[in-house]
Amino acid sequence: MEDGKPVWAPHPTDGFQVGNIVDIGPDSLTIEPLNQKGKTFLALINQVFPAEEDSKKDVEDNCSLMYLNEATLLHNIKVRYSKDRIYTYVANILIAVNPYFDIPKIYSSETIKSYQGKSLGTMPPHVFAIADKAFRDMKVLKLSQSIIVSGESGAGKTENTKFVLRYLTESYGTGQDIDDRIVEANPLLEAFGNAKTVRNNNSSRFGKFVEIHFNEKSSVVGGFVSHYLLEKSRICVQGKEERNYHIFYRLCAGASEDIRERLHLSSPDNFRYLNRGCTRYFANKETDKQILQNRKSPEYLKAGSLKDPLLDDHGDFIRMCTAMKKIGLDDEEKLDLFRVVAGVLHLGNIDFEEAGSTSGGCNLKNKSTQALEYCAEKLLGLDQDDLRVSLTTRVMLTTAGGAKGTVIKVPLKVEQANNARDALAKTVYSHLFDHVVNRVNQCFPFETSSYFIGVLDIAGFEYFEHNSFEQFCINYCNEKLQQFFNERILKEEQELYQKEGLGVNEVHYVDNQDCIDLIEARLVGILDILDEENRLPQPSDQHFTSAGHQKHKDHFRLSIPRKSKLAIHRNIAYDEGFIIRHFAGAVCYETTQFVEKNNDALHMSLESLICESRDKFIRELFESSTNNNKDTKQKAGKLSFISVGNKFKTQLNLLLDKLRSTGASFIRCIKPNLKMTSHHFEGAQILSQLQCSGMVSVLDLMQGGFPSRASFHEVYNMYKKSLPDKLARLDPRLFCKALFKALGLNEIDYKFGLTKVFFRPGKFAEFDQIMKSDPDHLAELVKRVNHWLICSRWKKVQWCSLSVIKLKNKIKYRAEACIKMQKTIRMWLCKRRHKPRIDGLVKVGTLKKRLDKFNEVVSALKDGKQEMSKQVKDLEISIDALMAKIKSTMMTREQIQKEYDALVKSSAVLLSALQKKKQQEEEAERLRRIQEEMEKERKRREEDEQRRRKEEEERRMKLEMEAKRKQEEEERKKREDDEKRIQAEVEAQLARQREEESQQQAVLEQERRDRELALRIAQSEAELISDEAQADPGLRRGPAVQATKAAAGTKKYDLSKWKYAELRDTINTSCDIELLAACREEFHRRLKVYHAWKSKNKKRNTETEQRAPKSVTDYAQQNPAVQLPARQQEIEMNRQQRFFRIPFIRSADQYKDPQNKKKGWWYAHFDGPWIARQMELHPDKPPILLVAGKDDMEMCELNLEETGLTRKRGAEILPRQFEEIWERCGGIQYLQNAIESRQARPTYATAMLQNLLK
């Protein structure tokens, strides 16, 4: 198959493996892996892709690959990753693979300088190139830009964000202190907002949108950081292998002895908020020695430090203090930050126990007294007793007649007191983080800003064994960002192509709007259902979950936990969780604490206490919040509720509005493995990331896409000031055309739309050259345009003169041709009218010539000479009379023949009489010769008659064929008229089927992603997935295939499991008519599927293989024939032998040959419904001969009805006409060789040739 060319086929762990096609199945291909010769496996045909011939080759832009598909995309990334080339383009989108180690000099200052002002594609792929492109787009287009850095947790988003910021400030900063502050703000934000998770050692547990603002001179003037959704639950509890926020550990590891004593710090295992997770520090050999022993936990002393090339708690503490100083924080403010952090730690050590009294409340444990003192008096500025009371009781106000009445203190149970303590800790830390962000923003203020470049770094799609409200919000955010990506890159791009008339093929992608509606829809969305639950007097997580399931019981995106592919999730009760099918896969959320985590308000006594702190810094932390939420709190007197979910939704919508108002660049970060180790490439999970991030859809779009564009007027206005008057009068479109021609651009690299010019992927340098607004550069380009216009106009004059001469010659040639045609037609008409008389005169004239021989015989006679002479004379008179009659009257062929026969008879009688008179041998010999000549004449006459009859028979057959075609055409029209009456119903049914098939395909695609995500969770959590989930989704059948298999079940023969070779052998050897018909049908159906696969996966910039003329294939696509059962089709055709001939021109020559000099002919011989022999005749190449069996892959795979040849006027020819051409081109020998080598399939043609050879 495919001449042994390699293909990519699915592999469970590597994503794809290379192999060869060895057989074609009903809807799958049999693949033999190259590294496992002799072993084969089945792969769905739409999951098999052609491979590049050079497996070690890599390209910087995946759009440069010969084959553009997800397998070659994955392989190219893998090859580059193995060479430490972690960046790759897909058009203007950057794919960044996390290397998990430091690559030397890749981010050095020298590297930054090398990318400044360089067009995308002129330098190797890099995050700096995207940053520079965003800056140049902002400068040229006068439009703010955004860079969206996305990817899973641990994929490298935070690091790439830092590199973008560093590049912009170093390259285009003013050289002042503000540039350093923007860069130095990152360590501070990371310390308070990043933490170690199981999938990322430096995971951002909040989202941020960093704006770098520029003035009118495109210099950095300031910045602004917006933050979203800090993960507050991490403050109180973490997973076993996870840590709290970095600041806690860095403070314990790196604080000086003075600070440690003032803040009463010790090792992490002594604090409740740290000791339930990992208590080890990040450190290297040097810093490990600098950390004092009393600051190390037992776990650290036993297992050693955590290792990460980018993290070091002791060193990072020092770097954080340096960053604080650079952004303007003095020692007092720095100590305030540390004091609040330590206060949160000590707050977590306050513990409770049941009270001995009957009140049902609780008291502080004795061992918590010191923690209470440290936290209240020394760190947070609170009264110990007030804090104790506020943590163990809750203040309620009775109401009477709508007015507030008596204050009642309600004792809290131990669990409630623990929740109150944790809520206070989360609130304090959250306000502290808000303060850090505000101080960061204050350190780089700006008065005026012309434009900005925003860099979005937000937590990637998260999926753990246990997922809660935080993961729900993060994944909701990622759904919205994926939709923005779909809109900006796929939807808006395709709408623009369609609007501009570029003719780019449509690319389908998964629309996740239904998932977003499920979460945020008004009243019925999960967020609104959760808010409604929070407003109830006694809200519960179980009631909220049940309400969600009830309102969306038939929603495709929402499911119950027991349908999960992971066994651990199937144990979750109906009212304790739900599954949402996200764009990246299904995630099971445990709804315990959803209600609690959605409420951002403290109960009244704690809120009042913290707002009235004696510490000025603490009061300032809560003052801004108090002012902002004043109205909310007044309402909260009753409900005490501030919705976290809806607050986040509002922030997210504002962010997306900002993104939509800017130009967008995308960096897709990829996590190469789950172990976070270097040089380890897990193909399957990387492929899943590429598919979920839309890279495969982008690759499909970019096969014919144009990522760069500019409007004609925009380009024209840029050059207008530099144009002389004669050029200024040019139409903008014409000016752009002249500009591109002057630059010598290849027409393949760009395309003109209605209002814009578009550039192919990889042509950003050419685009930037045109859009460069440097005055000297503009003047140079204008000079080139002027030169090109002069040359083009002179060439146009030359071409016009040549065209006029050609036109004159063509008119003269056509006039001569018309005269020649008229002469020929008149000659033919005249010949048809007078040919019987001319033929008669020729025959009678021949008879007259024989009279001389008669006279010679008579003159030699001795007796009866006079009598014989008279008879000869009479015969001559009769002949002359007949000749005169033929010339003077319009006699028919029959009349002439009758009188001619009479003369022949008379001459025969006369000859007989002469024979009697002539006795001598000499005379007898001469008479014998005359007899022979007459016999020859008779035979010639008979042959002429036979030829004439044959011509008449052929004319009759052609007339019958034409009449039959007209009859078939009339019957077809009648059928069409009948079909039109039910067409509306049929189309509606087909539309429903297509919609159902599309929905089913979306379900299958979503299930595939769900399974892949479950596998990745299973790998990371050492969990087993269900047997049902283990079933290979690659062999799940689509609706069309299921329908085919269902139909096959009703047939006599089930051929779905037969191999391609078995079908072929059965066709060649079987005598069972029904089996033969079924095998032929299945054989050609598989051929169609295989050729469709080849056409879809052809090389870039290559024409589709033509096994039949375009008119035939187009007809088959536009008019799908009704599929008759194979047996019925064979009977209806009755193995008729039909022959066809139609003009044929290769698509590559279609527009290069206006004179049709390369037009050839396509001949086909159909044996019943299927083709048996095929010929292509071209004027500039040898004839192409094909026979069924030997050349199935190159022959037309359509049946006769599908080709529409029987409906083409003049297409059908006589068998003799086909056989003459076939024999002349060496077809007999070709077919004989195929028969002798047992490659030809038994057909009418093979049987006839074998009989002829016998």
UniProtKB/Swiss-Prot annotation:
Partners and quaternary state? Homodimer; dimerization seems to implicate the unfolding of the three-helix bundle region creating an additional calmodulin binding site, and cargo binding. Component of the DISP/DOCK7-induced septin displacement complex, at least composed of DOCK7, LRCH3 and MYO6. Able to function as a monomer under specific conditions in vitro. Forms a complex with CFTR and DAB2 in the apical membrane of epithelial cells.
Q: Where is this region: SAH?
A: 918-985
Processing after translation = Phosphorylation in the motor domain, induced by EGF, results in translocation of MYO6 from the cell surface to membrane ruffles and affects F-actin dynamics. Phosphorylated in vitro by p21-activated kinase (PAK).
Q: What is this protein called?
A: Unconventional myosin-VI
Q: Which residues bind ATP?
A: G151, E152, S153, G154, A155, G156, K157, T158
| Segments of this protein annotated with the region Interaction with OPTN | 1085-1087
Localization of this protein: Golgi apparatus, trans-Golgi network membrane; Golgi apparatus; Nucleus; Cytoplasm, Perinuclear region
Task: Write down the species.
Answer: Sus scrofa (Pig)
